[in-house]
Amino acid sequence: MLLKNAVQLICYPDRIGNNLKDLYTVVDTHLSEAIGGLHILPFFPSNADGGFSPLTHKEVDPKVGTWDDIEAFTAKYDLCVDLTVNHISDESPEFTDFIANGFDSEYADLFVHVDKFGEISPDDMAKIHIRKEKEPFREVTLSDGTKTRVWCTFTEQQIDLNYESDLAYQLMESYIGFLTSKGVNLLRLDAFGYTTKRIGTSCFLVEPEVYQILDWVNQVALKHGAECLPEVHDHTSYQYAISRRNMHPYGFALPPLLLYSLLDANSTYLKNWLRMCPRNMVTVLDTHDGICIPDVEGVLPDEKIKVLIDNIDARSADPIMRRSAANIHSVGAIYQLTCTFYDALMQNDDAYIAARAIQFFTPGIPQVYYVGLLAGCNDHELMEQSGELRDINRHYYTLEEVEQDIQKPVVQRLLSLMKFRSNYPAFDGHFELNYSNNSSVAMAWRHGDYYCHLFVDLNFKTVKVTYTDVETGETRHLEC
């Protein structure tokens, strides 16, 4: 494994302070012993979706910093960066060249031209997995007045790439080579499941094409000294498929599983999952997205999922729903719950520390989202200003707020756990799920003479961590 076996921080380039320099100051001052890496969300020039509509992956948005700022991180920490494999901005040089030169553009085949599919029947439209309140197509007018349609899964500004063309692979390889030259060693493959377009299917995670694309990206990344973290929210079986392909899967089932376990004081389903979950995961409790429900389907019974949703609903903004391209106004089951993880646990410090302790003892590399690091609460004001439901969990912290919140008792307890997880050698060894009753969890790690054990009582939300001091041979207790 190329990555340090340590906690990583997930953060925006401009929401802990104003820019990358501010972020580095906070990390170096408060977190240097607590983390081994960072996932810095998109810092590229972008015109939509909070950075996820990049004009290029070869520039840093000057509003947040320079490549020197990025390389300051990579000199000391692992760095995960988003590679938006599905789309690029409509303001990118490639798409603006297509608008100017039409189908004579050297980049014309880089995009998915909807009209090549002919008329799409209502039945086929109904199958397409969509992410907005309209069909995933956009009509554009070329400079000569010709109108044509291109595929755009997300916002109108995010134009999907055509993986039936060599141009898409050439673009991705150039991005991967450039990012790794700056020290990036983990590529988060954003929205990769939407790269497959085959009418008559969901156009989402279509096999075998999706794995052919993934395997190619992973091969190129490994050649350049980086690993891959494909991002997909769907049935947990996809995470196993990713793991088998020598890539890191997300442990996206863990957040809803832990919420259910702590709110209902029932560890049965959590322990069932821990017995079989991939061992090379990246685990999260919170991210810049909401708490996704599809990831836990098949792990939690449907009636337990309903109990969880009903419990959290009062502390969440409106949920994000699943939609059909045939009828954009019809909604299916809940896709994401929108609230901070701390609020989901009713701002209960002990429950929150219990959740983090279980995350840190779960196999894989743990990531902590910046709002979660500071035990942040729902930012209703930002959400109402932007109209984006997920902004409830995307607070802009001033440096003064960080200095204040980092001293909160719950945050100091979390930092103690993070330092232990990032530095105690037992986590380089073997995972053990020990026997416990259905209202508790017992987990351990062993590596040579190093041994650590976690016991969590889900009723009382108490956490007990013990570990071996190899210098004295004594068993010690971690204050958390």
From Swiss-Prot:
<dbReference type="InterPro" id="IPR045857">
    <property type="entry name" value="O16G_dom_2"/>
</dbReference>
<feature type="active site" description="Nucleophile">
    <location>
        <position position="190"/>
    </location>
</feature>
<keyword id="KW-0808">Transferase</keyword>
<dbReference type="Pfam" id="PF00128">
    <property type="entry name" value="Alpha-amylase"/>
</dbReference>
<dbReference type="GO" id="GO:0004645">
    <property type="term" value="F:1,4-alpha-oligoglucan phosphorylase activity"/>
</dbReference>
<dbReference type="GO" id="GO:0051472">
    <property type="term" value="P:glucosylglycerol metabolic process"/>
</dbReference>
<comment type="function">
    <text>Catalyzes the reversible phosphorolysis of 2-O-alpha-D-glucosylglycerol with retention of the anomeric configuration, forming alpha-D-glucose 1-phosphate and glycerol. Has most likely a catabolic role, either regulating the intracellular levels of glucosylglycerol, which acts as a compatible solute, or degrading it when the environmental conditions change. Cannot catalyze the phosphorolysis of sucrose or glucosylglycerate.</text>
</comment>
<feature type="binding site">
    <location>
        <position position="336"/>
    </location>
    <ligand>
        <name>substrate</name>
    </ligand>
</feature>
<keyword id="KW-0328">Glycosyltransferase</keyword>
<feature type="active site" description="Proton donor">
    <location>
        <position position="231"/>
    </location>
</feature>
<protein>
    <recommendedName>
        <fullName>Glucosylglycerol phosphorylase</fullName>
        <ecNumber>2.4.1.359</ecNumber>
    </recommendedName>
</protein>
<dbReference type="GO" id="GO:0016757">
    <property type="term" value="F:glycosyltransferase activity"/>
</dbReference>
<comment type="similarity">
    <text>Belongs to the glycosyl hydrolase 13 family. Sucrose phosphorylase subfamily.</text>
</comment>
<dbReference type="InterPro" id="IPR016377">
    <property type="entry name" value="Sucrose_GGa_phosphorylase-rel"/>
</dbReference>
<feature type="binding site">
    <location>
        <position position="194"/>
    </location>
    <ligand>
        <name>substrate</name>
    </ligand>
</feature>
<keyword id="KW-0119">Carbohydrate metabolism</keyword>
<dbReference type="InterPro" id="IPR006047">
    <property type="entry name" value="Glyco_hydro_13_cat_dom"/>
</dbReference>
<dbReference type="InterPro" id="IPR022527">
    <property type="entry name" value="Sucrose_phospho"/>
</dbReference>
<dbReference type="InterPro" id="IPR017853">
    <property type="entry name" value="Glycoside_hydrolase_SF"/>
</dbReference>
